[in-house]
Amino acid sequence: MIRKIIFLEMLLLGIATFLYSQDEISKITITHGPYLQNVGSNEATIVWITDKPSIGWVELASDGNGSFYAKEHPRYFDTSNGIKNTSTIHAVKVKGLTPGKQYRYRVFAQEVLKHTGYKIIYGSYASTDVYYR
């Protein structure tokens, strides 16, 4: 009886370890960036690269006293013709910025596991720290 219990515990531990390691292997990461490109007086393009095909977006807020994480911010998606791009290279052009004003931003990527027609299956997220510019 003791052997059966030990065997069952070892089996469950092995399965849990395998599943955890598979989850860690499959997580998406942002490998490069974010970089500011084509900075104008009232616009900027934010570019970053991921290790897996994904959709991407930027959360942007004006520089303030409160924590960036305290509330939700508008999302600016990497799109073409209104459709979210699935890529490893992401670029989001943010318009309507006020000259001389500082902004805080953070980039995100969500892995696209499968994209068939209008059916999209998403995977895990990756994000950066908050940047001040």
How would you label these PLM feature ranges?
Residues M1-D23:
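Bacterial Sec-dependent N-terminal signal peptides
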Residues S21-R133:
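Acidic, histidine-bearing metal-coordination/catalytic regions of metal-dependent phosphoesterases
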